[in-house]
Structures are given as structure tokens and as C-alpha cells.
């Protein structure tokens, strides 16, 4: 059975989607995107582009969407007769010399024929003949079309969209030729169709290289995008704006976010998240939701002074409501980003953590902590570790709901990256000088896990567990009634003294210092 264009595209991008989900952490996704933009936004951008091509009317693949042209047509400077003639015309590569002659003509009517011819040659192929642009030195003339009347701007933008979608740093060539500044100015155009295409060009630019990302990540572009988001209801414009912001926000020079209105951006992105009904969205709206959540994830992690805005504008309540929606966890990428936003807020101050806990997040964590998706499981364990590092009341919430026995089981079955988050969550319980919590540690197998962590080969895990052990030994000494440290006795029974003595020869200075302190203070007779 033959595979259709749509099926082939869906298969290609479903595969990339699965590859993205297999990545370990959001930080890994961010790091990977520096060299090769593998984020979902990139995948959806490429998919949208290819779908745009296959949706062109057939068999006459040279025609253009009548809806778009109806707006353009009202503002053209050439004759309507020529406009419609070019609209229906078919151009082939065999006509290239004639097309170039028209394109280079000083006569506007002839030049327009050339523009349309080039655009249709680039658009009609799945792998467009971009090389003809550079072999025939046409790029400068195409860019100059951005300064002309709207029908030329439309054709020029379509050409640049196709050129910048190439694989050989074509975007850098367009920028070097002065095209970016002209495209940026078109974001002020009175026609949404022109603004949309200008954004599409910029969207292509920001997905090309790290050099291009850094070049475009500036207040001029950001402020224009923020203004567009604040003034439009056009779904395509919104989609491009949030995709560009998602890609560029992490490349803003020296992280000087005070040069852009971050508060306004947060509120606009939050409104979009709240407005979009996840269970009745089309694919474009879902992509917008993904990008918006990714933006808030980045902001909540890296621009921490704005966390309170997220709590005040209602988006966090909406996110938690969305997380609680039945079967939302099946959309693993979205579920992960939503949890990451919540985790970033919990990682803030006590008031911020308490607000999140008041919304019932702990029940969600318990429900999903045994997920088979290791990336999600690690994120959940990280969130729990932040809660367990908080005030005693919040530690007790985790105890009361029964999360710690589950964490102990996860530690014994999981890989290194998850174990360290579990260790943090368990060891944070020791940092309270309260008999209730410390007795809980002793009576529920957590001390055994801490000792297992000390025996591991991971420096970070050993250090965290040694710190916890010091807290416990101090507690045992303080509560001793006959001079016997019952924590010390338990450790001896587990055969940990030899382990501690051997760790004094560890290459890590801090491990040596901790083990030396433990033996000197609590086992001086050894």
C-alpha cells in the first residue's frame, strides 16, 4: 500500500517526538538545542512547513491560497489582470532563464512575473532548488522586494521562507545581506498576512545555528514579539511569536532581561495557557500551549524574581488543575513541563512552596511517582526532595501520605540519576532536631538507605548521606540515657565502621573530612 505525503510526515515527526521524550531531563533538552534544535517546537515548525506544501491545491501546485490572496489583492500596485494571470501560471525549471530575465527587469510588471516564478519554483518541490538563488545571485534582489509594494513583499517573503528553510546556513546569508532588518520592520505591517510571513522567516532563522540565535536574541525583537502578542488574536502570529521566544529566551545576552518587559511577557504567556482548552484544541493550539509552558519553565527556573507573578496571575492554579485532569500524564512531554514549572516554584521560598502545597500537589506526586517514564520519575523525586527540605510541617505532609516507603523502594530499583534525587528527599528529613522525624527515619528503613548511599560509587550521593549520618549521630548522642549512642550501635551492626574508615582514603577531600569527623567524634575507641 502506498504511503501518502501526510502519513510520511506524521511518521517522521512522531519518531522525533518519541526521541525527545527519551531524553533524560529538560536541562538535557535545553543543552542539546544549543547545537541542534531538537525541541518539539522545531519539530512542529518543520512539520507545519511541509504540511503547508502538501496542502497546496492540486493538480495545479503553482496556485496560492485564495484566502490569503484576497487580502493581498486589495492592496496591489500592479494590474489585477496580471496578478491573476501570474496566480494561475505554471513555472518550471526549464523556464529559469526567462524567469531570471523577468526578475532583473526594471519594468514592475515584468519583475513581478519573475518574483512569482522564483517563488513557485521554490515552493513546488519538497526539496526546493535553493541553489538557483545563489548560483544566479538573486538573493539581493529578493530582499529588495521587501521594500516594494505588498504583492512584491508577499512573493519576496515566500521566497525567503523557502530559502531559510535550507540546510546550509542560508539564514546567515540572508541576515548578512541585510534581509533581517527589513523583515523585522515588516512586523509593523498593517496586514496580518505579511506579519505572519515575516515571523515565519524569523522562526526559520532562529532554528538554524547558535550564531544566529545569539544574533537575534535582543530587546528589539523581543519587544516587537511582546507587542504582537499583546495586540493580536491571530493564531498563526501567536504561534510564531511564542515559538521564537521559546528558542531565543535562553540566548538573551548576559541574561539582561531587565531590557525587556518580562512581567508583561509572563502575563501574556500565562493568559494563553489559561485560555487554551487542552481537550478541545487543534494541533496548532497544542503547539502554542507546549511553547508557552516551555517559556514559563525557563523563566521560573532562571529568572527567579518573577515567581510571585506566576502565583498571582492564576496560571499556577490553572497548571495544577490541568495536571489533575484525568489521563493528562499520557501527554508525557506536556506533563513533564508542567511538573517542572511546579517544581521550580516549590524550589523558591517557604511562602511559594506553601501556596503550591495548598493546591494539593502532593496527591499528584504520589499518584505518578511510580511511572515507568524515568524522566518524569526523576522530576517527581526532585520536587519531593525540595518539599522535604522545607519546614517541618511540609515534611510531615510527605510522611502522612506515605511517600517515603515508596521512595525507599524506588532507590533500590532505580538508576543513578533518580537515586540521587531520592537520597536528597530522604536525607532532608534528618535536618530537623525533632524526635518524631528522626524516629521515623530509624523505624522505616531510611537509615539503611542512607548507609547504602555511603557505600555507593557516586561522590555526590556519598557526601549527602554522610551529612545525614552526622545529623543522626548527633541526635543519638543527644538522646543517650546511658552514654550509648543507639544510632552508632545500629551503624556498627550494619558493618559501616569499616566502610567509614576506608572512605578516609577517598580522593574527595570533603568525604575524607566527613568520615574523619564521624570516627573522631562518635567512634573514638576505634
Which residues make up each language-model segment?
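Elongated alpha-helical scaffolds that mediate protein-protein interactions in large eukaryotic proteins
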Residues: 84-92, 109-113, 121-140, 153-154, ...
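Buried hydrophobic core positions in alpha-solenoid tandem helical repeats
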Residues: 98-100, 141-143, 182-184, 224-226, ...
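Charged catalytic carboxylate motif
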Residues: 113, 137, 155, 182, ...
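Internal alpha-helical scaffold/solenoid segments in large eukaryotic proteins
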Residues: 167, 186, 379, 387, ...
Amino acid at each position: 500500500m502506498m504511503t501518502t505525503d501526510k502519513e510520511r510526515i506524521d511518521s517522521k515527526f512522531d519518531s522525533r517526538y518519541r526521541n525527545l521524550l527519551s531524553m533524560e531531563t529538560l536541562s538535557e533538552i535545553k543543552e542539546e538545542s544549543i547545537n541542534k534544535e531538537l525541541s518539539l517546537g522545531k519539530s512542529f515548525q518543520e512539520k507545519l512547513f511541509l504540511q503547508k506544501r502538501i496542502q497546496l491545491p492540486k493538480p495545479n501546485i503553482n496556485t496560492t491560497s485564495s484566502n490569503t490572496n484576497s487580502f493581498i489583492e486589495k492592496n496591489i500596485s500592479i494590474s489585477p489582470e496580471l496578478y491573476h494571470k501570474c496566480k494561475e501560471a505554471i513555472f518550471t525549471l526549464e523556464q529559469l532563464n526567462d524567469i531570471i530575465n523577468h526578475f532583473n527587469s526594471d519594468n514592475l510588471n515584468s519583475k513581478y512575473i519573475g518574483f512569482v516564478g522564483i517563488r513557485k519554483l521554490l515552493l513546488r518541490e519538497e526539496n526546493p532548488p535553493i541553489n538557483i538563488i545563489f548560483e544566479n545571485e538573486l538573493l539581493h534582489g529578493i530582499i529588495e522586494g521587501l521594500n516594494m509594494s505588498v504583492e512584491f513583499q508577499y512573493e519576496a517573503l515566500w521566497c525567503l521562507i523557502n530559502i531559510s528553510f535550507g540546510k546550509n546556513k542560508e539564514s546567515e546569508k540572508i541576515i548578512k545581506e541585510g534581509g533581517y532588518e527589513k523583515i523585522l520592520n515588516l512586523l509593523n505591517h498593517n496586514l496580518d498576512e505579511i506579519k505572519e510571513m515575516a515571523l515565519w522567516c524569523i522562526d526559520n532563522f532562529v532554528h538554524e545555528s547558535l550564531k544566529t540565535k545569539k544574533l537575534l536574541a535582543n530587546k528589539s525583537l523581543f519587544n516587537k514579539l511582546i507587542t504582537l502578542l499583546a495586540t493580536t488574536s491571530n493564531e498563526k502570529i501567536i504561534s510564531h511569536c511564542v515559538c521564537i521566544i521559546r528558542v531565543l529566551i535562553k540566548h538573551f545576552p548576559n541574561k539582561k532581561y531587565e531590557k525587556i518587559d518580562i512581567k508583561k511577557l509572563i502575563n501574556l504567556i500565562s493568559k494563553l495557557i489559561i485560555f487554551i482548552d487542552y481537550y478541545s484544541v487543534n494541533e496548532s493550539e497544542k503547539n502554542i500551549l507546549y511553547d508557552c509552558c516551555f517559556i514559563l519553565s525557563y523563566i521560573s527556573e532562571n529568572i527567579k524574581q518573577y515567581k510571585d507573578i506566576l502565583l498571582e496571575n492564576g496560571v499556577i492554579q490553572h497548571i495544577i488543575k490541568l495536571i489533575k485532569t484525568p489521563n493528562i500524564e499520557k501527554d508525557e512531554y506536556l506533563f513533564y513541563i508542567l511538573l517542572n514549572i511546579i517544581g521550580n516554584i516549590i524550589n523558591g521560598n517557604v511562602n511559594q512552596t506553601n501556596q503550591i502545597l495548598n493546591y494539593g500537589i502532593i496527591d499528584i506526586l504520589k499518584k505518578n511517582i511510580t511511572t515507568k517514564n524515568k524522566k518524569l520519575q526523576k522530576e517527581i523525586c526532585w520536587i519531593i526532595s525540595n518539599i522535604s527540605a522545607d519546614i517541618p510541617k511540609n515534611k510531615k505532609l510527605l510522611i502522612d501520605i506515605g511517600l517515603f516507603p515508596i521512595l525507599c523502594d524506588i532507590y533500590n530499583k532505580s538508576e543513578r540519576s533518580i537515586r540521587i534525587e531520592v537520597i536528597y528527599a530522604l536525607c532532608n528529613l534528618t535536618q530537623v532536631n525533632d524526635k518524631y522525624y528522626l524516629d521515623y527515619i530509624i523505624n522505616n528503613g531510611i537509615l539503611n538507605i542512607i548507609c547504602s548511599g555511603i557505600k555507593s560509587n557516586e561522590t555526590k550521593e556519598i557526601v549527602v548521606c554522610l551529612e545525614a549520618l552526622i545529623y543522626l549521630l548527633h541526635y543519638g548522642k543527644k538522646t543517650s540515657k546511658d552514654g550509648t549512642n543507639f544510632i552508632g550501635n545500629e551503624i556498627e551492626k550494619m558493618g559501616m565502621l569499616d566502610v567509614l574508615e576506608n572512605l578516609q582514603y577517598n580522593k574527595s577531600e570533603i568525604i575524607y573530612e566527613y568520615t574523619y569527623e564521624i570516627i573522631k567524634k562518635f567512634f573514638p575507641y576505634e
